[in-house]
Amino acid sequence: MEEFPGYFELDRSRQHDFLYPLIFRESIYALAHDHGLNRNRSTLFENEVDYDKKYSLIIVKRLITRMYQRNHLIISANGSVQNPFLGHNKNLYSKILSEGFAVIVEIPFSLRVLSSFERKEKDIAKSPTLRSIHSIFPFLEDQFSHLDYLSHVLIPYPIHLEIAVQTLRYWVKDASSLHLLRIFLHEYWNSFSTPKKHITLFLKGNSRFFLFLYNSYVCEYESIFLFIRNQSSHFQSTSSGVFFERILFYVKIDHLVEVFVGTDFLDIRSFFKDPNMHYVRYQGKSILASKDTPLLMNKWKYYLVNLWQYHFSVWSQPGRININQLGKYSLDFLGYFSNVQLKSSVVRNQTLENSFLINNAMKKLETTVPILPLIGSLSRAKFCNALGHPISKPTRTDSSDSDIIDRFVRICRNLSHYHSGSSKKKSLYRIKYILRLSCVKTLARKHKSSVRAFLKRLGSELGDEFLTEEGVVLAVIFPKASGRLYRGRIWYLDIPCINDWVGDAEGSIFTK
């Protein structure tokens, strides 16, 4: 227990850093403006509709002037009364504040990351860090097929913005900033016509700040959850008084007493000890998997529900968290359908007198491309009809031939790159066929020619354009397989960067 106080103790060296003065610095909003340019969109412009105009300091100065005025931060209890602080342009000012806050509130977290790199090597080894998202791929290849039970959990989002503020206040020790943050959050939330929309509304709405709030909430949840998971086998039969000292962990001790019945860590140790429990998170979902009986999975399920309910005031129904057997369940994971299948392997055993066959059953991971959702997305993007028959793109006939081909080839390569981890390529070949024929029909429509005549004129040149760069990469990685079509799985580490369109493939990949 000697090392536990060091872990639970808050970073005292930075709790007196004041962020409130930074809100009135024009340079902060200039940084936010530069970030907006990198995302091809920003709100700090003369016209909030025309995003091609130059950056304007006039709007920022006007906003800072209003924030300096004492009475303009008072929000009327009557929703119909106009807020004098935000005024008629409250949507624009809210977006500007959102971009500025996003830069400011990330400062304490950035300092923590930089300070961790300055520690000695032994301190870094002891620091509680989470694994990279790239560890998902070795988990799928090395661990997934050896597991028996799996639970696919949707991480609940905070239904009230005050929960996000309470989570943030443990790291930002500036009351003035938090008060202004609370005012801004409630006003920004009320600016939407339907305030009860899902948190993904903010994540997809070009709001870096709300993305940061959601990530900080998830980080706090995981830091608690994984700490108990990683330290469960090290708990000793000692008092749990030190364990309750961290306000970050126990905001509501009375409620958490109901979760952890008793005051001895032996109860927690026997409750959570499991060396075969695996936890993986991606986007707003997580996976719990175990090799043992479903009884332990059921215990972890109720622990998660109690943690969300009593610590984060988030209601989650235990009945909606299902525990599935991997052999009978297909997991929708990162744009793949993944399951574990039994493959029989027959071995002939020959002795001097007898010969007999040994049938061994082996578990094998199977990852397939979800063909129906992809065809549906292609249909909505007007590459094919609802049945998967390729159609032309009339909106592209004004472009040059090279631009049309380049766009279709880029989409095809992105799909091949992302779904290269599929163990069955047949569905992927069908998607490539749809894109290739849609490209040919678009070119034929532009030149007012038939598809057959256009293909005859081009010959194999168009087919060579659709050959992806995977062939070149495989020739370097697998020289022996370069002469034939390689059908194995290949996981590229950059595919999480394009997972915005996972589950809705008509996103950025079909609009590039």
UniProtKB/Swiss-Prot annotation:
Keyword tRNA processing: yes
One Pfam family from the record: Intron_maturas2
Cellular component terms per the entry's GO annotation: chloroplast
The organism's place on the tree of life at top rank: Eukaryota
Molecular-function GO terms, alphabetical: RNA binding
InterPro entries: Domain_X (IPR024937), Maturase_MatK (IPR002866), Maturase_MatK_N (IPR024942)
Any one biological process term the GO annotation gives: mRNA processing
Keywords: Chloroplast, mRNA processing, Plastid, RNA-binding, tRNA processing
Places the protein is found: Plastid, Chloroplast
Job description of the protein: Usually encoded in the trnK tRNA gene intron. Probably assists in splicing its own and other chloroplast group II introns.
Family membership: Belongs to the intron maturase 2 family. MatK subfamily.
The protein's name in its UniProt record: Maturase K
Organism: Oenothera parviflora (Small-flowered evening primrose)
Phylogenetic lineage: Eukaryota, Viridiplantae, Streptophyta, Embryophyta, Tracheophyta
